[in-house]
Amino acid sequence: NPDANGWHFTWSSCCRNSNITNGLADAGFTLRAVMYSYTDSLGQVLPSNDQCHDSSPKFYEIPRTILEVGNGNDPSAPAFSNGFTYSHNAFDEEKDSISYTWGIPLSNVGYDYLTPNSTALPFSAPYSYTNPINNIFLNSTTGRTWYPANQQGNFVTCTKVSAFKCGQLVSEIYREIQVVIIPPTCNIGLNANECNV
């Protein structure tokens, strides 16, 4: 059985984009998931015999990574809804409850499951792992993110999805997406034949 620290599944590689705006460019990265044991209603601790009895949440939305400045801009919309909205659409097959928080992106150097954040990607001010894009918002229940998409750049984001079975944490999966916001290539309101793409 995994101990209180869980089983950590990682994959690391080099390198991140050279043009990252909010953190260390060219650093490596580590993708990860953590599985924890839980006690069922009969008092049995699972997983047993080194076999997993649970799966982590899966993402049913492909990453939207390249956007134009002003994407989703609607001057008549309420201020909070005026921007780009994205949902990870995480789903847990066992119907475990899930919640979303910002995760800490990691480099590819020396992952330590006891202190995984020791290899955290350093962010450049004013950015942080909880504010990887200016004015970004994450709904912890739905996983929807919203941001104004009003600044060009390459932004590393990391979302942690935690799954709970009967109130017990059973898994965490971290999803990194690099969002690239480029200059406008198509004027809003033009049809597809008039766009410069």
Which residues make up each language-model segment?
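Long, compositionally biased, intrinsically disordered segments
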Residues: N1-C195
